[in-house]
Amino acid sequence: MILDFEESLRAFRKGSPVLIYDFEDREGETDIAIPAIHVGKDEVAMMRIDGGGLICVAIHPVAAEKLGLPFMHDVLRIASEKLPEIRKVADADDIKYDSRSSFSLWVNHRDTFTGITDVDRALTIRRIGEVVDEVMMGKKVDFGREFRSPGHVALLRAADKLTYERVGQTELSVALAEMAGIAPAVAICEMLDAETGKALTKEKAMEYAEEKGIPFIDGRTIVEHYRKFREVEVSLFV
């Protein structure tokens, strides 16, 4: 198992997976994280079989804003004005691990069939990564022309200040991508345990990382390095 932070960056730059563990006092979960632009059917199968959780794409807040991707709780709140029966669902404030979730829209690429197969989800995820890269480079993209909703890939909108504001897997994976200098869109999937019916323990996730030769990194390490990264960036422009 590789614990070195630089190895995690190198893996992301090559399009290889990294295992990210958040915090003991938060979800206490490990996610498989793969740069979206490098996701193919084999990567989707890996996340589906070895991870078992929800396959999502975490997106940088700047890209999400440019693409017009809202938080789902905002969509539900607005919808509840005309559909009052969903107000209680939209106003839920009892999330156990955070003050709010990062869910945005669920989408399929328009060239998919059902959208759920490994091939279909890979196309959706990979193209999301490419679109995020394009808008971060200043190109205008018509998101609705390529994607439809609802779909089978959940989009996650990272908090505006990333790990300075929230330290979920969404922000941790996007911060790692930003530090790696790649398109800040990352496919993530929770690792679950079929025997216990719960999240895979940190110890078992580390054993998996050791067996597969995949870098394993925790949230605290990412938060610390991202703070240093941002401080260096700011100093360059002062």
Swiss-Prot record:
Outline what the protein does. Catalyzes the conversion of D-ribulose 5-phosphate to formate and 3,4-dihydroxy-2-butanone 4-phosphate.
Q: Name one GO molecular function term.
A: manganese ion binding
Q: Which GO terms describe its cellular component?
A: cytosol
Q: How is the cofactor bound?
A: Binds 2 divalent metal cations per subunit. Magnesium or manganese.
Species: Archaeoglobus fulgidus (strain ATCC 49558 / DSM 4304 / JCM 9628 / NBRC 100126 / VC-16)
Cofactor(s) recorded in Swiss-Prot or TrEMBL: Mg(2+); Mn(2+)
User: What would be the name of the gene that encodes this protein?
Assistant: ribB
Q: What is this protein called?
A: 3,4-dihydroxy-2-butanone 4-phosphate synthase
Against HAMAP family, the record matches this protein to: RibB (MF_00180)
Give the multimer and partner information: Homodimer.
Work out whether the entry's keyword set contains GTP-binding. Answer: no
**Chain positions recorded as D-ribulose 5-phosphate binding sites:** 26-27, 31, 166-170, 190
Q: Which Pfam families match?
A: DHBP_synthase
